[in-house]
Amino acid sequence: DMGELENFRCQLEILLNELNPTDPEESNKGRVKTFLEQTLWPSTTYEINASEKTDLTIKDKNIGRNVVLFEFKKVNSAEMVTKDNLVKKAMFELVLYYILEEHEKKNTSIKHLVISDGYKYFIFEKAEFWELFGKDRKLVSEIKSSENTANEKREYIYNQIIRPKVEAVKDKLSFTFVDLETFAKETSAADIIAKPRFKALFKLFSPIHLQKLPFAEDHNTLNRKFYTELL
């Protein structure tokens, strides 16, 4: 739909103008929340908010469950993952959010997990998190037994329980990566909406992909190869 693509372009331009590398994490997180709400995740169907311990969640109001979990970091934070290094605090926090959501809240509706600083997005499939973390009974029980304790225990959970597990599986963790800054020079040009790379970005952020909703046959197949080539 050209109207949706044009709105996405317009909102992306606004987001990139408003994101500020020197601003605190909360400010940029708020801007991303607005971007999602104004584009493909309308408040009639979705609720996007901080949720207890999780930085940001997308909840599907129809099922009353979170479907996407976000961990945010300040731009250039030492705690942020990179393409070459996933053994970072941002990942430990995301794993903890996921375990609590899947095992304590019994929420099996999560589809994707995201680490972002506003510009960069590392998007992980829930199925992979389940295989590598959720199914690990020892990991889950250690987290659960430590979780209900004081805040200083949180660092213990990250460093002593989750970190070794992330170290062990880091080479098996695949993700889709996109840096919105690579679109910055083009978002003001109306013809960007015809470009395959822009359409791929649009689909990447859509409920069809992030929530794994069924989609019409005319959409390009949403596979990792497709995104890797375009983004």
Predicted region positions:
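Charged, often low-complexity linker/regulatory segments
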Residues: 1-50, 199, 224-228
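Charged, often flexible domain-edge or linker segments that flank or initiate folded functional domains
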Residues: 54, 59-87, 93-231
